[in-house]
């Protein structure tokens, strides 16, 4: 039985740091594990310009513990009024690594998101020419579409037509949750990749609803049927290099999750690697973990892999029920459960 696992230091290709006290409280959890992270721009107000992106990056860097090497990779929040010149300028000058497309009102702080994706095709053409990645929250928001069908409908209505129209555009299909998304990514050209979260590998929709409402298992996109979870597991542990790690770690204070209208988001950062590794061990795929966590993402983004390594050891430990941060009390994914691996 393997007792330790050493891999190149991984990256998180999708997460939320928030801002202010919460940001300062959660950045260290990510920085201790990952060398880089794609940081979501859905603040209030959102990160829509190069100047805002540069300022947010400095705030994040100020929250990184002394002596820790961590690089935030910033994203621009796309709106119906996005200035393509500023966007591309931010990319070419190293402020932005990618741009983020939120359909309006699809998730937390997305009210300023895009209402007409096709109207932004000229912006996407500019991005494709520059080699800039488009990160997409792939859900429709129409009131007549069942919440469990939002991703499937988005593929048919928006993602497939966009890819057909601009096949040179690199698209990161973020936090995929369905076998439909897996099939789309596998069938598309190499400019389509996808991140998979730990929660969507561990839980199906029963985890939100059985035994009472479970608010700390509620995120967007919501977890789906068991058949979809199994398809995601297969993609992560034995699929092509198009799939890579992205936690979608999204901290909210405990009391805002446990309320009459609880916030969407799972705080996966504190035990992210241990959570993913549990899945790879269950699928007898420990030898595939480094590719998913450390190699596939850099290859998709055209960035070098990290030179450093990290080691996880088989040391069972209990995840605390909550964590006290500068931003308040937050409940981590796997709270109250035992994990078999621990980062040294």
From Swiss-Prot:
Organism: Erythrobacter litoralis (strain HTCC2594)
Cofactor note as given: Binds 2 Zn(2+) ions per subunit.
Binding residue positions for Zn(2+) 1: 14, 16, 100, 248
InterPro entries: Amidohydro-rel (IPR006680), DHOdimr (IPR004721), Dihydroorotase_CS (IPR002195), Metal_Hydrolase (IPR032466)
Keywords: Hydrolase, Metal-binding, Pyrimidine biosynthesis, Zinc
Gene from which the chain derives: pyrC
Name of this protein: Dihydroorotase
GO cellular component, one term: cytosol
Sites of N6-carboxylysine modification: 100
A GO BP entry: 'de novo' UMP biosynthetic process
Pfam families in alphabetical order: Amidohydro_1
PROSITE patterns membership: DIHYDROOROTASE_1, DIHYDROOROTASE_2
Physiological role: Catalyzes the reversible cyclization of carbamoyl aspartate to dihydroorotate.
Named cofactor requirement(s): Zn(2+)
Family: Belongs to the metallo-dependent hydrolases superfamily. DHOase family. Class II DHOase subfamily.
Pathway(s) per entry: Pyrimidine metabolism; UMP biosynthesis via de novo pathway; (S)-dihydroorotate from bicarbonate: step 3/3
Record-listed Zn(2+) 2 binding positions: 100, 137, 175
Superkingdom, taxonomy of origin: Bacteria
Active site positions, chain numbering: 248
